[in-house]
Amino acid sequence: YTKETLDVALEELQSENVVQRKKCINFISMASRSELFGKTCDTLSVQTWFLSSENREKLIRVLHQETEEKLLWEYLLILLMVCERYIDHGCYAKDFAKESSCVEFKQRAYEIAKQYAHHSSAIVRQMSGSIIGYMGDNDVWDIFCNVMLKKRDLLTISHITLGIRRHCTGVANGDNHFFGGTMTNNQRIDILNSLRLVYQKSSNKSIKGMCLRTIEELENTKEVANKA
């Protein structure tokens, strides 16, 4: 993954051919998730590419033009992964995330997520929620509950339970900023009930296991919060 290969992929995202768009979005998505400082990724060059305001806005323009829900989900995943891996990751300089290019990228990602949080597609709402939660906004809990009423596949539930467990870890560690911010008691009850419903309705052992572990962790987190 280099600046040059990403430039080509970004240009070809404007293709009317959905197969071509899927190929290019997958390439950019893999770059956003690739091993940092690994053999296949020129990390600092790719970081600069993603954080360039020109590339960011081009990516957002093609995102707005996209009509395929799975590709929209992938665009939103890219925004989240850039925030996690190319801005906030612990391997960069201490105040790197405070640089204007980083602040602007996260602000735009948050704006886009808010915009797509009520999209007709449940998977698009889920990934919008994941970004909103990453930014510490507790609107994520209502979004996740809404999604679990409509969509209970392995990928969707794995992203939702990951977010909930990140929240639990952040609370337990006493972090200043953590996934989903403050969870109200009503939101906690709704999330637990939604997870129990998914558990009851699913015949998939992996989904059932994720739900059980997350329910247990969230129930334990409530006790920790009450003691504090």
Label every PLM stretch briefly:
Residues 1-31:
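N-terminal segments that cap or nucleate solenoid repeat domains
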Residues 2-11, 34-62, 86-116, 137-149, ...:
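Amphipathic alpha-helical scaffolding segments comprising HEAT/armadillo-like alpha-solenoid repeats
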Residues 16-17, 67-68, 120-121, 152-153, ...:
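Short inter-helical turns and helix N-cap capping residues of alpha-solenoid HEAT/ARM repeat scaffolds
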Residues 23-24, 75, 128, 160, ...:
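Conserved hydrophobic register position within alpha-solenoid helical repeats
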Residues 29-33, 77-84, 133, 165-169, ...:
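Structural signature of alpha-helical solenoid repeat scaffolds
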Residues 31, 73-80, 91, 95-96, ...:
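Surface-facing alpha-helical segments and adjacent helix-coil boundary elements at the starts of domains
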Residues 192, 196-228:
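Eukaryotic acidic, Ser/Thr-rich intrinsically disordered low-complexity regions
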